[in-house]
């Protein structure tokens, strides 16, 4: 454990310093490169390449070795610079389903000092147009199927081998290249490129917007380099075979599987789209050792364990990494009962913190039930009372603030949101109600904006949700505030029942009332086929709140 100032007196057990009310990471110090002109692609390529295969397409079996990867990254960058005219600061949009070539595009673009941004492939044309109007991309990498969602006349590189004239006629875009052809073309030999600084913007990914509108998060080369440095320091992530189960337009998917895994020498099996059976088939076929999952997928693995283990050989699987929401003791115990040879690790981070926050990195740490782990390398934390602004100490709840080299510079074109979220000292206000215990473990109580205010009491939805999904007839659940004239708000549950279940509203209400204080009782239940979530597995409470009040 290392601290920035030598005269600080820090409790080695909790990591807390009383003199400045700051918690420090107990992990190894983060080793960052001193070169101010080092771009993140060069930093990744400079790491020792221990592995052979970088990426595998799960559906076709097509492989991309590490040597092939860096060869085509250089070729695509050369084409972008000399033929398309991409320069430092230009924005390049990736609108594509998962593919082994997304990392190629991402690394090529950032090596030029240009900026990578992504869009959700499920978004409508109007939603994509709004994002394009804000980010103003010079170029879009997309497929022939998705090209019609783009505005006419925008420059496009196709990531599939469709007839470019047909695509231009049917969608109106201007095709300036085919990715497969760029990857085959020998480099020009002219290496003159713009000088890139670590403080330059490398990426601009849009936050999930679970509590409001989506915002473009600015990521510098320094932010991403800090992420990669932390990733390769996590020795348990080296030389593994991952299955990419999440969309690569999302920050976790892009950072972990287009950057971190490349630097660590691991192999990534990429699913073009998620399906539980597709994931299990990939584990069996490619002998995958680790899965990164959102909590709902973990629950699905528990519920279908007997059938899945009978159908697939999962003996290679050793680890599951889970993020998006803390796991309850009941869920963890159920998983370990069904999959006794697989260890669970948890992680906690935001798009704005680039994979840094807290995590469990050993079996012993994972046994700290309810905790999301110890603070990440290079991260400092404060717990701040949201009402008084007083900085809190060990085991005292408040809003979590984080600071460190991985913290974003802010939101693109949104100074108001930046100032609300990141203060002048660089502290990122996460909006989560948390506490850090005497051993330095971080516990997430709930989203501050999502706390239900019932007659002056604060009710954390996550606590009730953990109880609900422990019910044998409940597949998934979400709890929201429902407006009430007398109480202000009360807890309402949306419940997705398991197939064949006839669970009633009264049974749900009684199930919870027997386990919680009176002010935490659920007083209204609605049944729904599935709980709406973001690509990363976070519950879209704003959609449920809108649904619940639409009939008022």
Swiss-Prot record:
GO terms for molecular function: 4-coumarate-CoA ligase activity; ATP binding; CoA-ligase activity. A motif (Microbody targeting signal) lies at residues 550-552. CoA binds at residues 273, 455-456. Its cofactor is Mg(2+). Its EC number is 6.2.1.12. Both substrate-binding domains (SBD1 and SBD2) are involved in the substrate recognition, and are sufficient to confer the substrate specificity. This is 4-coumarate--CoA ligase-like 3. The gene is 4CLL3.
């Amino acid at each position: 454990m290392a601290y920035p100032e030598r005269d600080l007196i820090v409790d080695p057990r909790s990591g807390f310093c009383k003199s400045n009310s700051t918690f420090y990471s107990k992990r190894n110090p983060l080793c960052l490169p001193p070169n101010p002109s080092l771009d993140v692609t060069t930093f990744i390529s400079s790491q020792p390449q221990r592995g052979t295969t970088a990426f595998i397409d799960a559906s076709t079996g097509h492989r991309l070795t590490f040597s092939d990867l860096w060869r085509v990254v250089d070729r695509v960058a050369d084409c972008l610079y000399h033929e398309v005219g991409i320069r430092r600061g230009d924005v390049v949009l990736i609108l594509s389903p998962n593919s082994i070539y997304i990392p190629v595009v991402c690394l090529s673009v950032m090596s030029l000092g240009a900026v990578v941004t992504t869009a959700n492939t499920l978004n409508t044309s109007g939603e994509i147009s709004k994002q394009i109007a804000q980010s103003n991309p010079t170029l879009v990498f997309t497929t022939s199927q998705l090209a019609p969602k783009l505005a006419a006349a925008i420059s496009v590189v196709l990531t599939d081998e469709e007839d470019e004239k047909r695509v231009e006629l049917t969608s109106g875009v201007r095709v300036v290249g085919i990715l497969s052809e760029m990857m085959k073309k020998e480099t020009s030999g002219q290496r003159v490129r713009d000088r890139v600084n670590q403080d330059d913007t490398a990426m601009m990914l849009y936050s999930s917007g679970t509590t409001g509108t989506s915002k473009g998060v600015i990521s510098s080369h320094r932010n991403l380099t800090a992420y990669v440095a932390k990733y390769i320091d996590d020795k348990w992530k080296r030389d593994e075979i991952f299955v990419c189960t999440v969309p690569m337009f999302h920050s976790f998917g892009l950072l972990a599987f287009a950057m971190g895994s490349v630097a660590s020498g691991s192999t990534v099996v990429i699913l073009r789209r998620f399906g539980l059976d597709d994931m299990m088939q990939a584990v069996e076929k490619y002998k995958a050792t680790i899965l990164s999952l959102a909590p709902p997928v973990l629950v699905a693995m528990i519920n279908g364990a007997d059938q899945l283990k009978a159908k697939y050989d999962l003996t290679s699987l050793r680890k599951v990494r889970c993020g998006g929401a803390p796991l309850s003791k009941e869920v963890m115990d159920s998983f370990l009962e069904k999959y006794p040879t697989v260890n669970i690790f948890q992680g906690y981070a935001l798009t704005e913190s680039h994979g840094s926050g807290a995590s469990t990195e050993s079996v012993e740490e994972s046994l700290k039930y309810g905790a999301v782990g110890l603070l990440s390398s290079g991260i400092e934390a404060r717990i701040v009372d949201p009402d008084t602004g007083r900085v809190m100490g060990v085991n005292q709840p408040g809003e979590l603030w984080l600071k460190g080299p991985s913290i974003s510079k802010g939101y693109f074109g949104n100074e108001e949101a930046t100032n609300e979220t990141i203060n002048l000292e660089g502290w990122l206000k996460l909006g989560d109600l948390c506490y850090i215990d005497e051993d330095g473990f971080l516990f997430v109580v709930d989203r501050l904006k999502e706390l239900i205010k019932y007659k002056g009491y604060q009710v954390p939805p996550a606590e009730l949700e953990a109880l609900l999904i422990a019910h044998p007839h409940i597949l998934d659940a979400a709890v929201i505030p429902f407006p009430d004239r007398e109480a202000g708000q009360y807890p309402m549950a949306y419940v997705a029942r398991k197939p064949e279940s006839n669970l009633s509203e009264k049974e749900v209400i009684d199930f919870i009332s027997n386990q919680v204080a009176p002010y935490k009782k659920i007083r209204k239940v609605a049944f729904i086929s599935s709980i709406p979530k973001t690509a990363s597995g976070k519950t879209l409470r704003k959609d449920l709140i809108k649904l619940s009040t639409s009939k008022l």
